[in-house]
Regions:
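N-terminal secretory signal peptides that target proteins for export/translocation
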Residues: 1-7
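Conserved functional hotspots that engage anionic ligands or polymers and/or phospholipid headgroups
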Residues: 3, 12-15, 29, 41-42, ...
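N-terminal single-pass transmembrane signal-anchor helix
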Residues: 7-32
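N-terminal membrane-insertion alpha helix
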Residues: 34-42
């Protein structure tokens, strides 16, 4: 009788060991997955921050350019400096229907492709303040082609509203690239005004 009880105890011990191993695997596998993903997440966050910095650099450069043009009298307002091509990029509604070509309905990559249809790195439309402008310097003191900004003005009254040429929506798209592939992009939109003195 004694042997029978021991065999029963040995069998229950095996079940406990299997349950403990299963529990440890249930905790360990997700933990391994999580720790292997954190470098990817950190990389994605870094690209996003770099793209934001590029967009901010574009905004700063455009602000200085606009101030200079207003100060020296080259510009008396924003009329004639708005982005209007590709056709419809500045018009939110056409005959009461949402315009699919409106810049806010396009991704950053779609906007950049629409501005450079043949993909040669040169803008195919007028009235861009900057197009894929580099601004950073790498460790060897050379221009770093990975970081660029594209900046343009949109008439915030286009497609309706009271027309005036004293304000505009300044749009700055910062991009981070690896070769020709865009790793991340950030778009800033800031309403800028011109006050006649």
């Amino acid at each position: 009788m004694m042997n029978r009880g021991r065999r029963h105890e040995q069998g229950s011990g095996l079940i406990v060991v299997i349950m403990v191993v299963a529990l440890l695997m249930g905790i360990g596998i997700p933990l391994l997955t999580l720790t292997s993903m954190s470098p990817k997440v950190a990389g994605t966050m870094r690209y996003h921050e770099e793209a934001f910095n590029a967009a901010e650099a574009g905004f700063d450069a455009a602000r200085l350019l606009i101030e200079e043009n207003m100060t020296n009298g080259s510009w008396s307002g924003f009329a004639g400096h708005y982005l209007t091509l590709p056709l419809g990029i500045d018009i939110p509604m056409i005959l009461g229907v949402p315009n699919p070509s409106y810049f806010r309905r396009l991704t950053d990559q779609e906007i950049l492709q629409a501005l450079d249809l043949n993909g040669d790195g040169t803008a195919d439309v007028p009235n861009l303040l900057y197009f894929q402008q580099t601004f950073a310097v790498n460790g060897q003191g050379q221009t770093d082609l990975r970081y660029t900004y594209t900046v343009f003005l949109i008439n915030n009254e286009a497609g309706g509203g009271l027309a005036n040429n004293t304000d505009a929506l300044l749009v700055s798209i910062g991009t981070v690239r690896a070769g020709t592939r865009v790793l991340d992009s950030v778009r800033l939109e800031v309403l800028v005004t011109f006050e006649d003195e």
